[in-house]
Amino acid sequence: MTGGVRRRLPCLLCLVVLAGCGGGSDSVTVPKGFNLRTVEKPAFSVALPSAWRSFGDRSHTNAREVAGKNERLRTELETLARSDSPIKLVAFDPAAGRRFYTNMNVLQTQVPSKLSFDDMARTETTQISRASGVTDIRQQETRVPAGRTLRLTYRPRANAVVQQYFVRHGDLLYVLTYTTRESDAARYAKTFDRSAHTFQVG
C-alpha cells in the first residue's frame, strides 16, 4: 500500500462523519430538476438537485450562519475555507432538517502515477472495510464522464449510509461522498447516482 493512500483514509472517513482512472470527457446531460455546479480550481463540475445549496472555491460564506446548530456541517464548511483544504465542494439538501443534512462533498488528492485503477480500487475497498464501525460495504465499478470509477456503498455508523465514488484522473483522485440517514437511503440513492454520473473534469 502506498503512503499516500494510507494517509488519505482517515481524512475520507472523517469527512463522512463530519458530513452527518482518468479518461476522455464525455458529453453530460443534466438531469431534470438538477443544475450544474462548477468549481474553477481545480476545474470540475457536477450536477446537483436545484434546491441543494453548494459551496466551492469561490464561496465566501459564514459557516456558522449557513450551518446554524449543525456542528458537522459547520466544521466541513470551515475546512472548505482553508487554502490547503482537500475538500473542493460541499453541498447539502436544506430540506432534510437542521440536525442532519443529507449532503455531499468532493475531495481531491494526488495518487502515485504508477498506481493502477484496479490496485486503487482494491486498496480503497480494503481500507474502508477495515475501518471501525463500517458495515454492509458493497463495491461496484462504473464510469462517469471523468473516467472509470469505483463506487462503494456502506454504513459508517448507526443511522447513516454513504455512497462514495472514486474517480481517477491522471495523477489525481476525486472522491465524491454522498451521505444521508439510513431511513432516507432508498429515497436518495438514485439522486446520488444521477449526480455522480454527471461529474467531469476540465
Language-model region placement:
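Conserved polar/disulfide-associated segments of primarily extracytoplasmic proteins
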Residues: 30, 54-170, 174, 180-184
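N-terminal targeting sequences that direct proteins away from the cytosol to non-cytosolic compartments
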Residues: 1-84, 96, 179-202
